[in-house]
Structure formats: C-alpha cells, structure tokens
Regions:
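Short, surface-exposed loop or secondary-structure junction motifs
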Residues: 27, 127-370
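Positively charged n-region of N-terminal signal peptides that target proteins for export
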Residues: 1-4
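Short, conserved catalytic-motif segment at the N-terminal edge
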Residues: 25-95, 115-117, 131-139, 409, ...
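Bacterial N-terminal signal peptides
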Residues: 8-18
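Active-site SXXK
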Residues: 42-49, 62, 68, 93-125, ...
Length: 421
C-alpha cells in the first residue's frame, strides 16, 4: 500500500469511528433509578456553586454513574473565567496525571499479548536504563551536614516497578534529595520540549532517589513506561492510545492535544493560583506535542473518561468491547506495595498497577469502600471507581495548585452521602 492510500484509509477509519462514537454515551436515568437521592445530590450542586461564587473554582463538570447508568451529569460555572461562556458537558480538560491509567492499561494489554512480562527488566527494552546509580543521602559526622554518595542500584528496575512507582524515578521539582533534584535540572528531565526517546536518554543520566523495590516514589515512572509501550508496539504512544483504547471505547475527545476544530471547548483555569497568588501555567495542548508523556500529557472530557472508567468497572469490557481480561483488571486494582505501603502518602490506601487502591474501611480521610480505586490530575481532575457500589465518578475541573486536593475528599463525601441503597 502506498503512503497516500494508507493515509486516506487511516483517515477514513478514524472518521468512521468518530461518527459512530459521537452518539455513544452511557445511559442517562433519574438519580433514584441509579440508587441516589436527588435531594441529597442537590447538596453537591449547592457546594460547587458556592465554590464558584467565592471564586475558588472557575467551573466544573461532575458525572456520577452507577450500575452502568448515569444518575448525575451536571455542569457548573464557566468554561473560561476570562469569558462568559457557561461550562458545557463536552468541555475538554487537561487531565495531567489521569493520563497514567491509560498508559497502565496500554502496558497490561501488551502483557496479555505475551510481549511484556512484569518481571522484565526495563533495560531489556531501554538499554540506557541498565546499571543506574542511586543517590544516598547521609549525615557527615564531622560536620553534621548532609552529603550524598552515589552507589550502584542493587537490582534492575522492572516493568512492575514502573507501574507501581517503585523504580526510584521521581519528579525533579518535588524531590527532597538535593543531588537528584540538581541532576534532573541539569539534564532537563522535567522539560516538555523533547520526545519520549529523549526522556530516556536524559533520565538515564540522573541518579535514582532510592533503590528499586524499596519505596513508593511518585514520579516519571509512567513516562518511562510510555516509551516502553512505544518500543514494544512499534507505535507512538498517542497512536497506541487511539487505536487500542480510544477508538474501541468511542472516546472521541481524548488524546494528547485538542484538534483545530475543538479549542473553543477547552476549559481554562484562573490566571492566578487562588491560594498562593502565583501565576498559573497550564500545559499547551492546542498543537500536537513532540513529547507524548505517558504520565501527564492527556486531554479528555467527562463522558470520555467515564467510558474508560466504566470499562475498568466492567473488568475490562464496555458495550461488548473487551480491552483487558477480567483477571488482569482485578490484578491491576489490588495493592502491589505490600510492605512498602507505609511509603505511600494516602492514608488507608495502597497502590496497584496505575491506581491508588483502598485497603482499609477507615483511616482514609473520606468515604469509600475497600477495593475502590482512583487517580487524579495536577490540573484539578479526579476520578474513582467503586466496584462494591458499582460506582464511577468523575470531577473535571481546572483547579491547579493546593486547592485541588481539597476537592477530592469533598466530592467523595457528597456522592456517598447521596446513595440510597
């Protein structure tokens, strides 16, 4: 097949899928039919409207589905605080780290095909990541000052380590280890003007923050995993998402950028952080990026992400389309930290293969069920799945900064208090 014909065929296939998918939504019913009290759900609306009136949140979309049916799907505030357009249900949001579950699912699809094993050393696919060093901080007894010693990694980083963030990779802007932080700055590991392949070359030059498989450390593990998906599949990460996840699930507004016909639907944040007063800088998403970051670069809508979450709740299947086997989803959504759980920052939760997983009925700071799982994005988005309650919830907002952490337990409590059965 010649290249022009291939391009036309690919374009036709995309248009066909998009046309078919445009009408695909989860069934919408009255709150009571989904097991919710409409009166109690009104508390959620009052609360978010109050947040908007206080100018703490520019706008939001909330979608709550139970037993495969939407019982609550409402919008609040403005699409862009600089304008007057109300928030639409099909608003597009920068989901930041809610890209990570897509990358985790992509990885497990390759595991199911026998192309990856969780015990595989990452260096099998990315040779630059062999023989890494670890930056160990110690106190100099003579001076009392903190000094850093570089020591060899005692074990290989595995695919499982990337999925559960026990690799030793971190985020340079948040790590306390000074030597690691300086190395990330020197080699521009946290930059966005690179490719997925260039990330590996850069991060290979920086030391790990701890020995692999000794602690949870949230960071670039999923970005590295995105490059593994590319190498194993022979596709860019964005193309893999499109062909293997978005098209089958009819997620028509998800990807690594907002196409030319959709920027008017892109939600925006306040220009200043509502807590710190600092300028807010959001990811540029109106043009195709060179860096399709598996851990942070995605955009999506409430409905698109709900379809993805509903697939997970369905243990790998949605509308008859199966992406993963049921045992694989169960395996992903159970705790994989074990004795390392005390290094995970969320009380009452462990971490699976891409998700925080509730392991205790108490301890946590918000309502939920043992076995529920979730993740969030730095821009203010949040979702969770509760298999016990057959519940999928998405909060889509652009509220970066400290305040985003306030809305996560708030929305959980407001949803759970409205359950009738």
């Amino acid at each position: 097949m010649t290249r022009p014909i291939a391009l036309v065929t690919c374009l036709f296939g995309w248009l066909l899928v998009a046309a078919t998918a445009s009408a695909e939504v989860l069934p919408v019913v009255k709150p009571e039919e989904a097991g919710f009290s409409a009166d109690r759900l009104a508390r959620l609306a009052r609360t978010l409207k109050s947040e908007i009136e206080q100018k703490r949140m520019p706008g939001a979309v909330v979608l709550v589905a139970r037993r495969g049916r939407i019982g609550y799907f409402e919008t609040f505030g403005k699409l862009d605080p600089a304008g007057n357009a109300p928030m639409p249900k099909d608003a597009i949001f920068r989901v930041y780290s809610m890209t990570k579950p897509w990358t985790s699912v992509a990885t497990m699809m390759l595991v199911e095909e026998g192309r990856i094993v969780l015990t595989d050393p990452v260096a099998k696919f990315l040779p630059q990541l062999a023989k890494l060093q670890v930056a160990v901080e110690k106190t100099d007894p003579a001076t009392g000052k903190t000094v850093t010693e570089l020591v060899p990694a005692q074990r290989d980083i595995t695919i499982q380590d990337l999925l559960r963030h026990t690799s030793g990779f971190t985020y340079g802007m948040r790590v306390k280890n000074a030597a690691v932080r300086e190395a990330y700055v020197q080699h521009r590991v946290d930059a966005v003007d690179m490719t997925n392949a260039e990330l590996i070359d850069r991060i290979a030059k920086a030391p790990l923050v701890h020995q692999p498989r000794t602690a949870f450390e949230y960071g670039r593990s999923t970005d590295v995993l995105g490059r593994v998906v590319e190498v194993v599949s022979g596709m860019t990460l964005g193309r893999f998402f499109e062909q293997r996840i978005f098209w089958p699930l009819k997620m028509v507004d998800s990807g690594f950028h907002v196409p030319p016909d959709k920027p008017a639907r892109l939600a925006q944040a306040f220009p200043k952080d509502v807590v710190s007063g600092r300028d807010v800088r959001m990811l540029a998403v109106t043009a195709p990026p060179t860096y399709e970051a598996g851990g942070q670069g995605g955009v999506s809508t409430a409905m698109d992400y709900a379809r993805f979450a509903q697939m997970l709740l369905g243990r790998g299947v949605l509308d008859g389309t199966r992406l993963l086997g049921r045992h694989t989803v169960d395996f992903m959504t159970t705790d994989h930290l074990g004795k390392m759980r005390d290094t995970f920052p969320a009380a009452g939760y462990g971490f699976g293969l891409g998700f925080a997983v509730r392991v205790d009925p108490g301890v946590a700071t918000s309502a939920g069920s043992v076995g529920d799982y979730n993740w969030a994005g730095a821009g203010g988005t949040y979702f969770w799945v509760d298999p016990k309650e057959q519940l999928v919830v998405g909060l889509m907002a652009q509220t970066p900064g400290e305040i985003r952490a306030y809305y996560r337990p708030l929305i959980r409590d407001l949803v759970y208090q409205a359950l009738l059965d």
